[in-house]
């Protein structure tokens, strides 16, 4: 199994954490998105969207999107599950996972930040991300 990822990508972190929790051996391949390596033809053959992470399975299948990869890992390596089996606990975990992946990640994404000036970045970080994290913390503490 081979994981193409950027060291500082939160989506890549999610997959590396999932692989570590499951104790799965894999080869790590760095993709430096700061210099545009995700746009190289060789990488685009693996992931036509040009995002990290990309997991290449032992069967040669190319998987993208961190949550889809985590789901695939849970289905193919069920010995250690990433999500609780209890429906209520599972839903609470998924609420947090989706809040991070769908609400926080997009406004802290390098592709988005490149187009914003410093003033907007500070506004997003100060108001958007911080308020979402505070709400998540409240949700977790309940």
Residue ranges of model-derived segments:
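GST-like domain detector, emphasizing the conserved glutathione-binding G-site
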Residues: 1-124
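Amphipathic alpha-helical packing segments from all-alpha helical-bundle domains
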Residues: 125-142
């Amino acid at each position: 199994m081979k994981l193409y990822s950027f060291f500082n990508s939160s989506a890549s972190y999610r997959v590396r954490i999932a692989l570590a929790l499951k104790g799965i051996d894999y080869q790590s391949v760095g993709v430096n998105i700061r210099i545009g390596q995700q746009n190289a033809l060789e990488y685009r053959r693996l992931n036509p969207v040009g995002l990290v992470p990309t997991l290449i399975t032992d069967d040669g299948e190319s998987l993208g999107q961190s949550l889809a990869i985590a789901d695939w890992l849970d289905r193919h390596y069920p010995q250690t599950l990433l999500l609780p089996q209890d429906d209520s606990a599972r839903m609470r975990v998924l609420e947090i996972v989706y809040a991070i992946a769908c609400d926080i990640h997009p406004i802290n994404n390098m592709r988005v930040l490149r187009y914003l000036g410093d003033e907007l970045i500070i506004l997003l970080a100060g108001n958007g991300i911080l308020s979402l994290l505070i709400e998540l913390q409240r949700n977790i503490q309940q």
